[in-house]
Structures are given as C-alpha cells and as structure tokens.
Curated annotation (Swiss-Prot):
Compartments, record wording: Cell membrane
Membrane topology according to the record: Multi-pass membrane protein
Species for this entry: Clostridium perfringens (strain ATCC 13124 / DSM 756 / JCM 1290 / NCIMB 6125 / NCTC 8237 / Type A)
PANTHER family linked: UPF0182 PROTEIN SLL1060 (PTHR39344:SF1)
Name recorded for this polypeptide: UPF0182 protein CPF_0011
HAMAP family xref list: UPF0182
Region (Disordered): 857-876
Feature: compositional bias, Basic and acidic residues: 857-869
Iron-sulfur among keywords: no
Length: 918
C-alpha cells in the first residue's frame, strides 16, 4: 500500500515537472505581455483558437462518427457480434485522435482568416469584373477557399478511413468461415462495393460537387492573372478561361449526380463518361486559352487589352497610394541669379553637406569613447535648436555586446547604452568634421533640447536579456579611469522572485540565473530589448520599416518606428516586393528606458487597420493621443517611398496605350556606389533587411539612388521643410525626367509632389552629374593628386534641389588616410548649375565662385569658424587656431591615428610659419 502511494506521489511530481517545463514559454509570455500592457492581445489568438477548435472538433467528430455509424452493419458482418464491441472502442479512439488533429490544424492555421472574415471592413471600391468590394478578396475569399480545401481534405480522410478499415479487418481475420456466420472478405460476392458502396457513392458525389464549387471560386483568382500584358484578368481570362470554369463547375454538379446514381446501380460507364468529360474540359481550357491568346489577342492586343490595362493602372495606383500625386511640369532654367539665391537663401542655408556613411565612420572613431559602445546607425531628423529649425544627424550610443566575454558583464554589468551624438546636416567644422551639438559622455549639450535621462535599455542591437537592480549596480558611464554605476529605477522588466529565477534558469538553460548571488528579489529581468523584435512580438501582423530612429522627447529618449498594413490580394494591382497594397497606417513609439510600446493609428481610412482595430481591442491608440512634440518628428518612411518610386517607374502614366507600348518607362536614377575603395556615402548605415528595401548593385558598381531626407523649399511654397527626394531617368537612358518629393512637416505629411522635366532636354541625373565631376579636368586633377598621396577619396551624397525654376547640384568630397583608425573629413564642395561647375573648400566659396553670391549671414553651411588660408587676421586668432590644432594632434596621437596626427601637425606648421612672417 505504501509503495503504491509513493509511486503515485512520484508520478504526480514527475508529471508536474514535465508540465512545468512544457509550459515555461507560456508562463513567461503571459508575464511579459502583462508587463507591456498587452495581455489581451496575447489572449486574442489563444481565445480565437479555442473558440474555433471546439466547433470544428465537434464537426469533425460528428461527421466521422456518423460515417462510421453507416458502416456498422458491414463491420459487424466482417468481425461478428462478439468482436464488434471491442472494435467500436478502437473506432472511438481513432475518431478522437483524427478529430483533435484535424480541428487543431484547422484552428491554428485558420483562426486569423476567420477573425478577418468576421471583422471585415469595406474598402468602398469594387473590382471591375465581378463588382465585388475589395474587402471580399482581402478578408473573405482566402477563408472561403481554405474551408473548401479543408472540406475536400475531410472527404479524402473519410475515403481513406473506409479503405483502411476494409483492408485492416480483412488482413486481421484473413478468411472467415461460413460456419461462423462470417462473410469471406475476399469472396467475389463481398467486395468493397458491398462493404461501403453507398457511402463511397455519397463521398464521390460530394467531392465532385466541391470540385465544381472550387472552380467557381477559382474564377475570382483571375483578378491576379499574369497572362496578359498587364496584371489582372485580361481578354483571354474573361472571354475564355472564366467561361470554361463555369462550364467545368456545371459539369461537376452533373457528374456528382451521375456518380451517385451509377455507383448505387453498379453502372460504371456513366461514371467514366462524366469524369472523362470533366478531364477533357480541364485539359481543353489552357489549350483554347493559349490559342486565343496567340491567334486572336496578339494580332489585336492593343485594342482588346486596353480596358484591362486601364483596370491595372487604376488599381495599382490606388493600392500603392500614388493616385493623388501632385504633378507639375518644370522647364529648368540653367541660370540661377544672385537675386534668386537671395530670395531662397533658406534653401542655401540648409544645403546638406554631410553624408551618412562618412559621418557614421567619424562617429565611430571619435564618439564611441570606449570600445564597449557602438553606433549602429545615423538617422536624419529635425529639431528647433536655439530657436532655429535645424536638420540634424542623430545616432544613439548603444552597448556592443559582442565585446562582452563573461556572463556577468553581458547580462548584469553592461546593461544599457548612454546618450547620443547629434550634429548639423548643413555644416562642418573648419577641418571638415561633423559640427556637433550633442556629444561625449556625460552628454555635452550646446542646444536648448532637454535631455535628462540619456540611458538606452532598448535599442537596435540589444538582442540579449539583462538583469538590473543587482548587487554591485550597473555600469553607467566612464569618467577618466573611474566608472559610474547606476541602479535601474524604471518600470521595465519582470521581478526576479524565487519562482521566476527557477523559471528563467530553465528558459535560458543557464543555472547562473538561479545561483548568482548578485541577483536579489528586487532585481528585474528585461526581455525582448531589441525594439524590432519587441514590437513584432506584440503585433506580428504588421510589417515594420527597416530604419527605426531615436527622438529626444520630454527629457528622455524614445524610438519611433513606421509600421505598414499590407496584402497581396488587391485585384488588378501589380505586386512589388511581395505586396500589392500597402499603407503606412501606424506609428510605433518605444521608450528607450522603460520599454513602453504605443501604437498610434495614422491612417483612419485604411480598411486593414480598421479591421485590426476590431480584432485587437485596446492595442491601437488614436493619433490625437500622441504628444504634439512627437508629431513634429514624423518622417515619411524611406522604405515605403522607395517602393512607391519603383512602382512609379511604370505606373506614372494614365494612358493605357503608353503602358502597352512601353514608350514612357522610367528607371530610378543610378549612382556610382564605389570609387577608389569602400563606399561610405549611400544611405543610412545599419538598416535591417526588409521586403521593402532590396536594391542591389549592378556589375558596374551602380545602384539605385536612395531617397534622401533634405531640408528644402518647393518652388510654390514659402517655408523650408524636410522632404524625401528621389530622381527618375527615362528607361535605358541617364537623362533625368522627373523628381519625386514626399512632404512630412505638419499638415502636409504624406503628400507626394512630382516635377516632370521635358524629355527632349538633357537634364543631369545623379549618375550623369557624377560622370561630369570625374571628367572635369580641374576636379579630376585635384582628386588624382589626393589619391596619389595615399589618401582615399570618398564621394558624399549627390544632392539635386529645385530653386524656383532651376536645379542646383551639390556633391561633397571626403578624404580619408589609408590607415586603420583614420577618419573621413569633408574637404571639398562641388557645386553646379547648368553648364557651370566649380570645386571649392566650402559652400560659401563655391557660391561666390559659381554665382558671385555671398550671403548676408556669415558661414551658415560649412566651415563656420574658418579663417581662410593665408589670412590670419590677428595674433590672437592665430594663436587660438594653433592651440586648437595642437590639441587635436595630441588627441589623434592618443588614438593611434598617425595619419590624422601628421595632417594636424602640418597645418600647425603652416600657421606658425605665417605668424612668424608677420
């Protein structure tokens, strides 16, 4: 008795341990979703699956049970009365297993489609063939097709059950003797027809009926056809294929009746004829369609396909939100006058003279402070700095976890990044280096931007958990040879109770969490610190932009991310990057200190986000609840902009004839991305791979020019604003034909503006401008001289901005010594308008040389504090400059950057020589 009790206790404990191990992930998910405030979102899926599982299980179980019940007489005849009761138990158990597996598979794969179906929101647009609202294709048709597939699968399962039972019972008992009143299963008088003839007749009839209905549903898929010259149903699809599908559907209905009757009457000829007829129709359809396409449509393709091309143009433009672009014609004037520059001096003041790649390289050399920090990315944003609207580069200083070798350092000690580097986009120092407004540790802030808490616990590179509030504290930031510590006082993380210590030791497969004496009951474990993974865990049904950016808000740091709703089910819209409908419907804000995540709806007209609002109650907030100062940092997402640009290369036209003849196809402008070494000029570094950013280099080291965030002013506007610009060429040519701009300031957010240039004129595109630079004898001579001295020449971003009815071209040149720790510095500015091109040390000199223009304000764009070479204005200024150069040389020496050290010493020598001559 005692042994039985002991065994029972041991088995119970063992079961509890197994259940605990199996449910570890579930328990942690429940705690984590509760911490972030979205527990209802987590349970939405589970509740939906459970709600679906029960009725689907009952349906499966009842259908199979009823079917088996119809076989009871045949089974009893095979096994006899004595064995029938035991056989019934096996059938019941098998039915349970099959029903559980079938219901589980259906519920776990179809729950989302069912929620979309029941919460569908109309688009208010119908397709031109079936006149169905777009919501039918996006929310309803996928579920209906899946359910039909499930029904067909169930019929096949029932057929297999019949065959398995028939064979299993036959092999089990082999040959039964007539004296036992059991029929011989192998006798000619008792085959499978007599065993389950009526049942199979019903199944065959239902299967034929389902196949017929599936062809009717298949007709709706013609709106995604790729047969014709445009995406979506074409002439052949509508006039031939659709008719065949209807005929096949009718034939299947007739066949279902014929099959049912024929099986019952043992007449197989009608079955063969009906099935053969359907097979002939199925084979004949593509043959007739190909014949029609080749011999009817092709000779008259323009006339026959014209309406369907129009459908594709309209649908694609609406689906990618490019149907309301403000298009303007521009005839560029090749001469920019000084008066025109003075009228647009705010554009000149904000010309972008820094490029992301070289700037990030400089940040990594100068602003890391210690090797356990890293800068993953440098993003463009704008702030009101000391009362002036200013565009800046911002890069957060995160912890480099790859440099951590011990568990304590990686998870307990180095828990967070610290601060950021911020520099002006439109200016550099006298040495061509970034003009910082925030830098160093602790943060040196020369702006009126309030940053009280610069700590970053959640970021782009934080892929591991950390445990905070431990004995000994966390490393905060270095000051000389000492280290400052910090104890986390935020709201993020889960309390490390004894239960959780055991739980996370199992989950992370690391006993140190349980055994470490540094962890107390007040400690917290912070999970999902990578901001992309964090938001994906909460809302995996959204697509996220590859470039989150950090914002200073209310004295702390927050991340802003763009999220998209998308589908590939929009009728007649040609897919790009796997989607054929997309909206930037959500802005996500993640607190870098606490990890709080807020989802704000920015497009209330998007049916997909409105469907999600009905499904996930409490997940999304209205935009009106977002703090106003955060709205000032909205950016038009670059991934979406580049996707729209790709679509526009073909779908910028409204005339179906032009699309058919391909006489007006565009390409996004190319740019040389490598010259004399590593490319550092293109785009934001550290961008995540995304379905929306897949530009690739060609064999000539050319890639599509990435859209650039610039501060500029449209010809018809009064105020400067941040915009995203992209450039287009005629297909196969390099002359620029259009400029696309996305607006993002204030009420203009989301507006797209396009300037079209006359195609008969040669308008320099980015790559033509780059070629012109390299072919100019004065510029190429200077560049060759630098390259000959062992320096690496790096081109910055090519900027093309409209100034009223003219175009101004800008490119910067960086020099970088060929040494491991050297830093790129901006040394020359190339400026061009019309046929004139100049190269100078800074914007001011380039403007003076090109236009004889000197702004009334001093040194706005670059080299703000520069004293021109050979013009030392006073002894004090010369001494100050010499002292500054000496300090920079010493700093370069400490960093082991001997190339930069030598450069500073040479400059110092020049100044001292000039001073001695005076």
């Amino acid at each position: 008795m005692k042994n039985k009790i002991l065994n029972t206790v041991l088995i119970s404990i063992l079961l509890l341990v197994v259940v605990f191990f199996v449910s570890t992930n579930f328990i942690i998910n429940v705690q984590w979703f509760k911490e972030v405030g979205y527990l209802n979102v987590f349970f939405t899926k589970l509740i939906a699956i459970c709600k679906l599982f029960v009725p689907i299980f009952i349906l499966y179980f009842c259908v199979i049970a009823i079917y088996l019940f119809t076989l009871r007489k045949s089974i009893r005849s095979l096994v006899g009365d004595t064995k029938f009761k035991s056989v019934k138990k096996y059938f019941l158990l098998s039915n349970l297993v099959i029903s559980i597996l079938g219901a589980g598979a259906t519920a776990t794969t179809q729950w989302y489609k069912i929620l979309q179906f029941t919460n569908a929101v109309p688009f208010g647009e119908v397709d031109p063939i079936f006149n169905k609202d777009i919501s039918f294709y996006v929310f309803k048709l996928p579920l209906v097709q899946s359910l039909f597939s499930t029904a067909i699968s169930l019929i096949i399962i029932l057929v297999l059950i019949t065959v398995i039972i028939y064979l299993a019972l036959g092999f089990k008992d082999k040959i039964y003797q007539n004296k036992d009143n059991v029929i011989n299963i192998n006798s000619k008088t008792y085959g499978i027809r007599k065993f389950a003839g009526k049942q199979l007749a019903v199944l065959a009839s239902v299967l034929s009926l389902l196949i017929g209905c599936s062809y009717l549903l298949k007709s709706y898929n013609l709106v995604y056809s790729t047969r014709g010259v445009s995406y979506g149903a074409g002439y052949t699809d509508v006039k031939i294929t659709m008719i065949f599908y209807k005929v096949i559907a009718v034939a299947c209905v007739i066949s279902s009746i014929v099959v049912f009757i024929s099986i019952l009457k043992l007449k197989f000829r009608p079955i063969i004829i009906s099935i053969a007829s359907i097979a002939v129709l199925i084979v004949l359809e593509p043959v007739v369609a190909i014949f029609t396409q080749q011999f009817v449509v092709k000779p008259n393709e323009m006339e026959l396909e014209k309406p369907y091309i129009s459908y594709s143009i309209d649908a694609t433009k609406k689906a990618f939100n490019i149907d309301e672009i403000e298009v303007k014609e521009m005839e560029p004037n090749e001469n920019i006058t000084s008066e025109k520059l003075e009228d647009n001096k705010d554009i000149i003041e904000n010309l972008k003279v820094n490029s992301t790649g070289p700037l990030l390289s400089f940040y990594q050399q100068v602003q890391l402070i210690k090797n356990y920090y890293e800068f993953n990315d440098a993003d463009t944003d704008r702030y009101n700095i000391n009362g002036k609207y200013t565009q800046v580069f911002v890069s957060p200083r995160e912890i480099n976890r790859d440099s951590m070798t011990t568990w304590q350092n990686k998870h307990l000690r180095y828990t967070h990044g610290y601060g950021l580097a911020m520099s002006r986009v439109n200016s550099v120092t006298e040495f061509g280096q970034p003009d910082f407004v925030m830098k160093d540790i602790p943060t040196v802030n020369t702006t009126d931007i309030n940053l009280e808490n610069p700590r970053i616990y959640f970021g782009e590179s934080d892929n591991d958990y950390v445990i905070v509030n431990t004995e000994g504290g966390e490393f905060d930031y270095p000051t000389g040879d000492t280290e400052n510590t910090f104890n986390y006082n935020g709201t993020g993380g889960l309390k490390m109770t004894p239960f959780n210590r055991v739980l996370f030791s199992i989950y992370e497969r690391n006993p140190k969490i349980l055994m470490s004496s540094s962890i107390t009951s007040e400690s917290r474990i912070i999970l999902n610190r990578n901001i992309v993974k964090r938001v994906q865990e909460i809302a995996p049904f959204l697509t996220y932009d590859s470039d989150p950016y950090i914002v200073v808000h209310d004295g702390r740091l927050v991340w802003m991310m763009d999220a998209y709703t998308s589908t590939d089910k929009y009728p007649f819209s040609e897919p790009h990057e796997g989607v054929n409908y997309i909206r930037n419907s959500v802005k996500v804000v993640v607190d870098a200190f606490n990890g709080n995540v807020d989802f704000y709806v920015t497009d209330e007209n998007d049916p997909i986000i409105n469907c999600y609002l009905k499904i996930y109650k409490g997940l999304f907030k209205p935009l009106s609840e977002m703090p106003e100062d955060l709205k000032e940092h909205f950016r038009y997402p670059q991934d979406l902009f580049e996707l729209q640009s790709k679509v526009l290369t073909k779908y910028h036209v409204d005339d179906p004839i032009k699309l058919f003849t391909e006489e007006d196809l565009w390409d996004r402008s190319l740019e040389v991305v490598k010259h004399g070494g590593e490319n550092l000029s293109q785009g934001d570094e550290g961008k995540e791979e995304s379905i929306l950013n897949k530009a690739k280099e060609n064999k000539n080291n050319e890639a599509e020019n990435e859209g650039l965030y610039l501060m500029t002013k449209l010809p018809d506007e009064e105020n400067v604003e941040m915009m995203l610009l992209d450039y287009f060429n005629m297909r196969g040519k390099q002359s620029m034909v259009a400029l696309l701009g996305a607006r993002m300031d204030g009420d203009n957010y989301g507006e797209l503006v396009m300037y079209k240039f006359p195609p008969q004129r040669t308008i320099y595109s980015p790559i033509l401008f780059k070629n012109r630079i390299q072919q100019d004898p004065n510029i190429s001579k200077e560049i060759s001289l630098w390259a000959g001295k062992g320096s690496e020449v790096i081109y910055g971003d090519i900027i093309i901005v409209p100034i009223e009815d003219s175009l101004l071209y800008l490119n910067t040149i960086y020099l970088k010594a060929n040494s491991e720790n050297s830093m790129p510095e901006m040394k020359r500015v190339i400026l061009s308008n019309g046929d004139k091109i100049v190269i100078e040390e800074n914007i001011e000199k380039a403007l003076l040389k090109l236009f004889n223009y000197s702004s009334s304000e001093e040194n706005k764009n670059s080299n703000k504090d520069e004293t021109p070479k050979n013009e030392i204005t006073s002894d004090n200024s010369g001494i100050k400059e010499a002292a500054d150069l000496f300090n920079k040389a010493i700093e370069a020496q400490k960093n082991g950057d001997w190339a930069t050290y030598g450069e500073f010493i040479n400059k110092l020598g020049d100044i001292l020589n000039k001073m001695s001559q005076e």
